[in-house]
């Protein structure tokens, strides 16, 4: 299994929109679903700060992830640009 983990800092005034867009039914998950190897997305919030989040995106294996990126890179970049106002920092952890 290939797991991608990202950490995000989110301003309080856009938390609801962030949770919609980055959650299991959001824009990223819908885009990833174009891959037959996509297994799901989970969203976690830091209960102490309420402004730090983790996303965990699961693919069948690294090959499925690489194939998705090769076939959907333009859409991937477009979603990133469209949603960048929802975060003040992001780190690709895994």
PLM feature segments, named:
Residues 2-9, 40-70:
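Short, well-ordered beta-strand segments in beta-rich or mixed alpha/beta enzyme
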Residues 8-11, 15-16:
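N-terminal presequence-like segments and adjacent domain-start helices
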Residues 15-18, 52:
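Alpha-helix N-cap/helix-start motif
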Residues 17, 23-39, 58-94:
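An amphipathic, aromatic/His-enriched active-site/gating alpha helix that lines ligand/cofactor pockets
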């Amino acid at each position: 299994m290939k797991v991608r983990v990202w950490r995000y800092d989110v301003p309080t005034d856009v938390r609801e929109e962030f949770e919609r867009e980055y959650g299991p039914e959001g824009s990223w998950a819908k885009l990833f679903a174009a891959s037959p190897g996509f297994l799901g997305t989970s969203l976690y919030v830091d209960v102490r700060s309420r402004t730090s989040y983790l996303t965990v995106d699961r693919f069948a294996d690294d090959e499925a992830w690489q194939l998705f990126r090769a076939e959907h890179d333009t859409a991937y970049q477009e979603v990133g640009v469209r949603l960048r106002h929802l975060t003040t920092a992001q780190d690709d952890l895994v």
